[in-house]
Amino acid sequence: MRNIASFFSSVFNPLLLPTYGVFLVLWVSILCYLPVGSRLTVLLVIFGITCILPMVLIALLHNMRIITDKQLRTRQERWIPYIFATLCYVGAAFYLIHVHSPLWLTAFMWGAIASIVVACVVNFFWKISAHATGIAGLVALLFSLHNMGLAAFDIMWLICLTIVLAGAVGSSRIALGHHTLGQVLAGYVNGVVCIYLAELLFS
């Protein structure tokens, strides 16, 4: 059981979720008709900015003994990586603007930035689940694509699958003892509200 929980926690690491989100947009929305090479280039750049760079920083902080745990399970050690991740996400948003991405794609990144800022602020007095925030953001993104008529095909099955995965990820965090039910639920709310509002405001 613990191995399954660890699997879900690793596969849906918060640093991977922006890449998953951009992948979904590029492959299930009307943008799927763009050349594959162009889509892969955007995806790889987003992966580098929002995943590789923060991972390198976390490794450096760990080697410098500024943080004691690469998994950032200690609340007090999360704020520096959160701030750096926010800067990386801002860079990713401006990259999407630079390549003339639709406003509703850039909105996803601004929503992700907002969710990190909320998590960072809350982190000073309570621990909120970043995993739950990220996976709930994907659910909100898919709902937005569906409601705005931007999906290239019927994605209700994908929305349902993502909701199930969100439940699995949240349950995994609780099973591993990293979060309470309240912290996971707060993460869900954070992800859904930030991404959905960003899509409404910027689209």
Question: What residue spans do the PLM features occupy?
Answer:
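Short, Lys/Arg-rich, polar N-terminal cytosolic tail immediately upstream
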Residues: 1-6
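Juxtamembrane helix-capping/reentrant segments at transmembrane boundaries
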Residues: 8, 69-84
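The first (N-terminal) embedded transmembrane alpha-helix
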Residues: 9-29
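Membrane-interface helix termini and inter-helical loops of multi-pass transporters
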Residues: 29-38, 67-70, 98-102, 149-151, ...
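Loop-to-helix transition at the N-terminal end of transmembrane alpha-helices
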Residues: 36-52, 75-76, 188
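Cytosolic, membrane-interface loops and tails of multi-pass inner-membrane proteins
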Residues: 59-72
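Core segments of transmembrane alpha-helices
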Residues: 84-93, 134-139
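Membrane-embedded catalytic cores of phosphoryl/pyrophosphoryl-handling enzymes
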Residues: 99, 104-203
